[in-house]
Amino acid sequence: MKKIILSFALAGSITFAWAQQDPTAMKYAGIISPDLAKKHLSIIASDAYEGRETGKPGAEKAAHYIADEFKSLGLQPIVNGSYFFDVPLTENSLNATFAVGGKAFANGDSFYAVQPSTDRVLNTSEIVFVGYGTDAEIANTDLTGKIVLWINEDKAADGKPQGTSFRGSEARAAITKNLLSKNPAIILAANSEIAGVLTKYKNYILAPRLTIKKEDAKPADTKPAVFWITNEVAEELVKSGGKTYEQLKAGGGTAQTIKADVKISYNSVKKDVKAVDVLGFLPGSDPKLKDEVLVISAHYDHIGLLPEGTKGDRVNNGADDDGSGTTGIMTIARAFSKAKKDGHGPRRSILFLGNVGEEKGLLGSEYYTDHPVIPLANTIADLNIDMIGRVGYEYKDKADSANYVYVIGSGMLSTDLHNVGEKANKTYTNMVLDYKYDDPKDPNDFYHRSDHYNFAKHGVPIIFYFNGEHADYHGVGDEVSKINFPLLAKRAQLAFYTAWDLVNADNRPVVDGKKEEGSK
């Protein structure tokens, strides 16, 4: 379907080649320069900002830098006279112990716990092995209050394993839900890839989780916890049963009870965390249109520091992710602010939105869209910029590597918005607009992985600009020295031209697409 839509858009965009360029727009787009981008990014992605992790001093420092820039540009502070929009967060850390037959296993080395909602201590002399957890395997088996060992891998129709993917599948998600409905004490989900995942991502897995603090918090959910475990732990759990875990795995069949001395405990520790989105407002000049607002967003947070004791560089600078997008909205803000000072202000208003907590689960944008300063009904679109300073895997060493950008979501809710983006590109920037990831069902799931999604789920049309992942994604190699500043500036100019057309058009983009099922 997306290829059909793209072909139609390109066919319809033939007239864009003759669209008249607006010299006023081009004048102010020129403010978005490689030098200006480098000036900002060299500061916010420096080691002094310590990777800008949400809730840490580096992120707070970045928020103040952005606010100071907004103030210098004359943008209005619309949060009760402030540029800072408080995002109340809770830090959730977990203490967990796990022993089998007196042998202790360490959280993050042999298992990890999907954040439980309650605290528990479990002591048992037996477990229930449920194979792949199919209905046939657990039929007539009472799992209430039991420690359940489950092979968390896919099983083909012929009964043989067909994959171990850690990423999961719809079938396994359904099995998990079904097993949880049986009210076990805990589910121990064994997967062959867990050992490697824990080796690579231990620090991330053990890091405290941030969630939005709920003012009307409901009583804690009492559903059972799920621990992902390695095959080594699974072998220890079943060894008294006369068969190895691999033999049980190959055998399948019905659920069975196995003697095992198991001790498990876990408890959560919570504390409040201070975090802010940064909002700068440029009011529109048209009395009839100024109440309509275009949002231009980027997240300024990143993933912070590697643990103390790490050899070499500890700072995840996040120059591309998303220092580049943050730099983009600051340069675009400068261009629009200068236009307004010169008497060419936008007809509609613009909200420049620096989001916090994106790396923690799109938290800042979620809180903003649930508690908007400007009604979402008045928000005509969100142009979200996340990673625009590098060349991704698929364009590396290609002839057009310095003249492309991935565009995601532009036509999912509004054909008008898609066409405006196409027209801006054809008229001014002439980049390759790659729609490869423009699909909510794309296995990379990029549509749901940045802040635009929280607008889209409320029915606000969006465009997500993205350069694709690269070898330094979420690593210490994401440095300013590797940024292609002319490419960053050109991508930001594309967003500027698209915004220029949106805020000055007679009509806002018509929403003719449907929100995803389950969206608000």
PLM regions with names:
Residues 50-159, 420:
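Noncatalytic luminal/extracellular "stalk/propeptide" segments of secretory-pathway proteins
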Residues 23-31, 47-57, 72, 85-86, ...:
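Second-shell loop/turn segments in exported
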Residues 106-107, 224-242, 355-462:
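Metal-dependent peptidase/peptidase-like ectodomains
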